[in-house]
UniProtKB/Swiss-Prot annotation:
Belongs to the ectatomin family. Ectatomin-Et subfamily. It comes from the Eukaryota. This is Omega/M-ectatotoxin-Et1a subunit B. Algogenic for animals, human and insects. At high concentrations (0.5-1 uM), it acts as a pore-forming protein that forms nonselective cation channels both in cell and artificial membranes. It is weakly selective for cation over anions channel conductance is identical in both directions. At lower concentrations (1-10 nM), this heterodimer inhibits cardiac L-type calcium currents in isolated rat cardiac ventricular myocytes.
Amino acid sequence: WSTIVKLTICPTLKSMAKKCEGSIATMIKKKCDK
């Protein structure tokens, strides 16, 4: 993912991932950590 996408979308996705459990949360974290 581009840096801009990471900086803007990933904080939102990570906050959502905290509410989610399982594979979806893991997938978001993996994509945002790259």
